[in-house]
Each structure stands twice: as structure tokens, then as C-alpha cells.
């Protein structure tokens, strides 16, 4: 809520990009929503960041990523993915974080 309150106090254009797990669409239990939202950040598939006064800052940078396959396999929406798909997702994650680390460290 602090980020929403901070944005509300700004007298300018604001944009908040939120990840909100959907139990029905994602094939997870309702009680797992918060854990899944944290897990997507921990495995590096979603990053927490702010862009303020012309500067981009990563708010949370995991020292080591947790297992992407564990995150993916717990969700029904990804049941069709095989190991090669998961490896492609990991490669995309690594490329994204290499870019972030190179340009926004």
C-alpha cells in the first residue's frame, strides 16, 4: 500500500504495474496466492522496481534465483510446458536480468 500511497501523492502521471495471481486462471489454491506472488519475484520472472525522477531502481534483487521449474509446475496454467519450454523461460529470465544488471546497477 505504501507504493500506492506514494503514487497518489505525486501530482503527475503515475503507472503501477502489479502482478496479481488468479486462483482460477492460474490453477492454484486461493491460500497460495501471496506465496506464488513472492515466488515469481524470487525466481526472477518478475522484478520489483520504481522509476522516479528519471531514475530506474530495482527494489528487490534476489542474490540467487529460486527454481523456475518449481514455480511453473505448481500452476495448472503451465501444465502443458515441457523441460525445453522451461529452459527457454530460464534463458529469457537470464537475458532480462543481464540487461537490468548492465544498465541499471
What are these regions (language model features)?
Residues 1-30:
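ATP/pyrophosphate-binding catalytic subdomain of soluble kinases
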Residues 20-105:
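Flexible, low-complexity linker and terminal segments
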